[in-house]
Amino acid sequence: MTTDKKDTRAEFDNIVNMTAKELRRWLDTDESKSVGQKSEGGGESTGHRSGRRIVDILEKNDLTDDDYAHMRKVVGYTHRHLEQRPSGDIVDSKWRYSLMNWGHDPLKP
């Protein structure tokens, strides 16, 4: 594994703080499906689709270059989104729900 891939994996593992099981369970909720940017025709949001891909990545051992590219996308998106934290209670916020679709629960230690 190259240094770049090791760094990507370490950053991904640091920012994705939900297990595959937790994320899969979350993605089945109405709250998960209620947030995120959807295409004109509706359907699944970008974040929800990413969450399903994250579950796959968390469960596999042999990662492809496409997997590493998605891991970098997850890290970048999550860092940007964390900077937009709203004021007040975030427990039931769309901001938190969106982050959880990307595998990061800001309420987890």
Predicted features by range, described:
Residues T2-P109:
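A charge-rich, low-complexity, intrinsically flexible signal that marks solvent-exposed coils, linkers
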